[in-house]
């Protein structure tokens, strides 16, 4: 968000259930989530109530954020949205699934002679950043091992799907909500090159509603979608700056003078903290 941006909409007082990405807002709705699951797996579940949401909301503040975690039959699925490439996702998912399993067996004894059954995990990332990425990429935990001889004793695989407009077309056709989400993101990116971020997001929302794209969702959640979109884009921009700074720091052969990464809070972090404290968008605009 740029200084001087004028915003007047209000959002509900935020709480620990606050959704920090449009993707998470959309697919936290069970009907949308079951549609996404069916598209990814080729299944045809009709009853969204078969899903049990097990996302660890407090894990966001522990640095172990995962957008969506749910159980279906005997499996547990971890879905995450990413707008920047992150090779550490398998390690993060390993820690996250450990917390999930700890909660799952909390009231059961792991020292008994009876085998404790647990849901089989499936890990997936939905990527819509600006870096060129294949439609499907497999990330492996073993890639992080400093030295590895032979097959790893511990492996974790994450399937990353490129969900930018024009990618994974068959998947998009199977999940209309995902397809329309990709269109919305593309509109925001297009207009940010032509106008300030606040106006770009507003225009993208207006156009999508007029063209029948995510109509019900955008009308119902307009103010929150607008703020979250601004936060997302600002975060994406800050992460790009961070990577550039890290690259430049590396070119200086380890010299630390003049470069301090991660010391100051970004504007997005400040806004996010204000939202969690219950500030309205109008008040946030006044102080930022």
Task: Show where each model-derived region lies.
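Elongated, amphipathic alpha-helical interaction scaffolds
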Residues: 1-288
């Amino acid at each position: 968000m740029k200084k001087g941006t004028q915003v007047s909409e209000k959002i509900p007082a935020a709480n620990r259930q606050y959704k920090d990405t449009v993707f998470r807002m959309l697919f936290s709705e069970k009907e949308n989530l079951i549609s996404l699951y069916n598209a990814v797996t080729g299944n045809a579940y009709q009853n969204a109530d078969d899903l049990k949401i097990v996302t660890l909301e407090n894990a966001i503040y522990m640095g172990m954020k995962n957008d969506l975690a749910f159980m279906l039959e005997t499996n547990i699925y971890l879905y995450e949205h990413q707008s920047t490439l992150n090779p550490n996702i398998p390690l993060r998912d390993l820690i996250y699934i450990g917390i999930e399993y700890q909660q799952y067996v909390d009231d059961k004894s792991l020292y008994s002679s009876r085998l404790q059954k647990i849901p089989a995990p499936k890990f997936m990332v939905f990527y819509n950043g600006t870096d060129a990425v294949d439609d499907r990429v497999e990330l492996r935990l073993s890639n992080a091992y400093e030295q590895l001889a032979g097959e790893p004793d511990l492996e974790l695989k994450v399937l990353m799907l490129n969900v930018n407009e024009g990618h994974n077309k068959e998947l998009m056709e199977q999940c209309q909500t995902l397809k329309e989400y990709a269109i919305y993101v593309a509109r925001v990116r297009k207009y940010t090159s032509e106008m300030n971020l606040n106006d770009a997001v507003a225009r993208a929302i207006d156009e999508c509603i007029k063209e029948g794209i995510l109509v019900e969702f955008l009308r119902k959640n307009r103010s929150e979608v607008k703020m979250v979109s601004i936060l997302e884009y600002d975060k994406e921009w800050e992460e790009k700056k961070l990577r550039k700074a890290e690259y430049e720091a590396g070119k200086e052969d380890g010299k630390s003078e003049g470069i301090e990464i991660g010391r100051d809070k970004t504007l997005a972090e400040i806004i996010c903290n204000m939202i969690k404290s219950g500030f309205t968008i109008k008040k946030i605009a006044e102080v930022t």
